[in-house]
UniProtKB/Swiss-Prot annotation:
One Gene Ontology cellular component annotation held by this UniProt entry: cytosol
Family label: Belongs to the glyceraldehyde-3-phosphate dehydrogenase family.
Site (Activates thiol group during catalysis): H185
NCBIfam families xref list: GAPDH-I
CDD domains linked to this entry: GAPDH_I_C, GAPDH_I_N
Alphabetical keyword list: Cytoplasm, Glycolysis, NAD, Oxidoreductase
EC numbers on record: 1.2.1.12
Name by which UniProt lists this protein: Glyceraldehyde-3-phosphate dehydrogenase 3.1
Pathway note: Carbohydrate degradation; glycolysis; pyruvate from D-glyceraldehyde 3-phosphate: step 1/5
Length: 341
């Protein structure tokens, strides 16, 4: 089977890292990129140099309106570059892009993302939560994808991708009665470098580098969409903190069946080494956030930081590279749905 051909709309943090993940994994072929705000020579620069994940360990250049991205031992990606503001005008079909990653953060509903299908794409994967597109989390519910009907899908959020695999393992083994999640989350591009206006969410407009900022997140409630048994049982919030990348989920839950911390560690480790290998990881090391920069897992369970009050009330800690781990799952989701074509 030939590799799925992919287009990327929006060459921001996630768009560029999806391309990096695609080059590393060598499982999909990126054939087109669209961004109306970035010239092709600037794309080369932004892709080559990354303050968080380091310099791209390969070659990147441009020839006419094509980006040429290569890495030793991997396939070269010859990528047609478009600069269209209207997604309906992007010629995905003529570039051969069957699967489009919608990573602008703008076209996140079925109606808006549908414009990509007009340009010749067959499937659209939104790299953000969606109000109405079905959400799939690799390792949790990706097998519920329906090729005949699911043309526009969401890869959910980075936080849902961290929380859902852990919640699945705990719920499958011990049952979750209810739970609260907090994510201590790295800054993202929507935040302000210094205090500024921010619509109705006044706290979100405060300086990202100087504050711990309480913020809302739908990530915990979204777990109920990907694990229906947990619908209505989880909610959560976020603290935005002044770090550039890597976040951590704290899941505090009441369990149906009593469990010791060792019981929990055992089932999480078994899942990380078995059915959720590559998605969920397990560590007993004395780690901190920078230890997970560029980690490709969705969720890394921190056995040493997790605690229990009693056998039915637990606090579980799991790390995630909110940029790169998530981008790897976008590529994995495309690889999976392509097998159903």
């Amino acid at each position: 089977m030939s590799k799925p051909s992919v287009g990327i709309n929006g060459f921001g943090r996630i768009g560029r890292l999806v391309l990096r993940a695609a080059v590393e994994k060598d499982s999909v072929n990126v054939v087109a990129v669209n961004d109306p705000f970035i010239s092709i020579d600037y794309m080369v620069y932004l892709f080559q140099y990354d303050s968080t994940h380091g310099r791209f360990k390969g070659t990147v250049a441009h020839e006419g309106d094509y980006l040429l991205v290569a890495k030793e031992g991997k396939s070269q990606h010859k990528i047609k570059v478009y600069n269209s503001r209207d997604p309906a005008e992007i010629q995905w079909g003529s570039a051969g892009a069957d699967y489009v990653v919608e990573s602008t953060g703008v076209f996140t509903t079925i109606e808006k993302a549908n414009a990509h299908l007009k340009g010749g794409a067959k499937k659209v994967i939104i790299s953000a939560p969606s109000a109405d597109a079905p959400m799939f989390v690799v390792g949790v519910n990706h097998e519920k994808y329906d090729h005949a009907n699911d043309h526009i899908i969401s890869n959910a959020s980075c936080t849902t991708n961290c929380l859902a695999p852990l919640a699945k393992v705990i719920n499958d083994n011990f049952g979750i009665i209810e739970g609260l999640m907090t994510t201590v989350h790295a800054v993202t591009a929507t935040q302000k470098t210094v205090d500024g206006p921010s619509g109705k969410l006044w706290r979100d407009g405060r300086g990202a580098g100087q504050n711990i900022i309480p913020a809302s997140t739908g990530a915990a409630k979204a777990v109920g969409k990907v694990i229906p048994e947990l619908n209505g049982k989880l909610t959560g919030m976020a603290f935005r903190v002044p770090t550039p990348d890597v976040s951590v989920v704290d899941l505090t839950a009441r369990l149906e069946k009593p469990a010791s911390l060792d019981d929990i560690k055992k089932v999480v480790k078994a899942a990380a080494e078995g059915p959720l290998k590559g998605v969920l990881a397990y560590t007993e090391d004395q780690v901190v956030s920078t230890d997970f920069v560029s980690d490709t897992h969705s969720s890394i369970f921190d056995a040493g930081a997790s605690i229990i009050l009693n056998p039915n009330f637990v606090k579980l800690i799991s790390w995630y590279d909110n940029e790169f781990g998530y981008s790897n799952r976008v590529v994995d989701l495309i690889s999976y749905i392509a097998t159903k074509a």
